[in-house]
C-alpha cells in the first residue's frame, strides 16, 4: 500500500483514503484522487472504494481502482462512475475531507488463511440480514462467478434513483428476446406502478 501511495505522490497526484466500513463486518476504504496541476483541464476527480477481508487489502483495492479508472490523469479521458458519486469539483467532495483520522488497524477485519472462514465470519457479522448468492457462471468458460444480494442494503446502480426494478428492466431490454422482455416489463409495471422508469 505504501508503495502504491508513493507512486501517486511521485506523479503529483493527491490521494486521500477514508473509512467507509459503516459498522459492517468487512472493511471498506474509499479513495479520492486528483492531480492539482491538470484538474479541470485534462483530468478529473476520481472517487472509488474497495472492500476486502483486511483493511490493507481494502485500501489497495480502492487505490488500484483509482489507477484503473483514471488512467494517467492527463489525457482528457473520462471515467464512468461505478456506484459512487462523481465529483466535478473538490468543493462537491468537501464532506469526504471532514471527520476524524483513523488508522487502518482500527477498521474491522475477517482476514484468515482460509477464504471459507473469511466468508463465514463476514456472513455471521451481517446477521440478522440474510445474504443470497446467485450463480452467474458462464457455462462455456466455467469460471465460478456469482452476484450477491443482501435485502435491505443499497443496490449499486448507475442512476440517481436507484431501484432493483430499474436494473431488472434494463437487463430485460438489453438481453431478453422481445416477448420475454414485454412480459417482464408488464410484471415490473405491476410491482412499480409509479416508477420513473
How should these model regions be labeled?
Residues 1-197:
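Helix-biased "structured C-terminal domain" signature
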Amino acid at each position: 500500500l505504501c508503495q502504491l501511495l508513493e507512486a501517486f505522490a511521485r506523479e503529483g497526484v493527491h490521494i486521500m483514503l477514508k473509512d467507509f466500513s459503516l459498522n459492517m463486518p468487512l472493511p471498506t476504504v474509499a479513495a479520492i484522487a486528483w492531480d492539482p496541476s491538470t484538474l479541470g483541464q485534462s483530468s478529473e476527480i476520481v472517487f472509488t472504494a474497495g472492500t476486502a477481508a483486511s483493511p490493507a487489502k481494502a485500501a489497495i483495492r480502492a487505490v488500484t481502482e483509482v489507477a484503473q479508472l483514471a488512467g494517467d490523469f492527463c489525457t482528457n479521458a473520462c471515467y464512468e462512475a461505478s456506484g459512487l458519486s462523481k465529483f466535478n469539483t473538490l468543493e462537491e467532495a468537501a464532506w469526504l475531507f471532514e471527520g476524524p483520522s483513523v488508522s487502518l488497524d482500527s477498521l474491522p477485519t475477517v482476514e484468515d488463511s482460509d477464504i471459507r472462514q473469511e466468508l463465514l465470519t463476514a456472513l455471521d457479522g451481517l446477521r440478522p440480514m440474510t445474504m443470497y448468492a446467485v450463480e452467474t457462471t458462464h457455462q462455456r468458460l466455467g469460471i465460478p462467478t456469482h452476484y450477491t444480494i443482501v435485502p435491505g442494503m443499497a443496490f449499486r446502480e448507475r442512476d440517481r434513483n436507484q431501484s432493483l426494478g430499474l436494473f431488472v428492466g434494463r437487463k430485460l431490454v438489453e438481453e431478453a428476446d422481445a416477448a420475454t422482455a414485454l412480459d417482464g416489463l408488464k410484471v415490473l409495471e405491476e410491482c412499480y406502478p409509479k416508477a420513473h422508469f
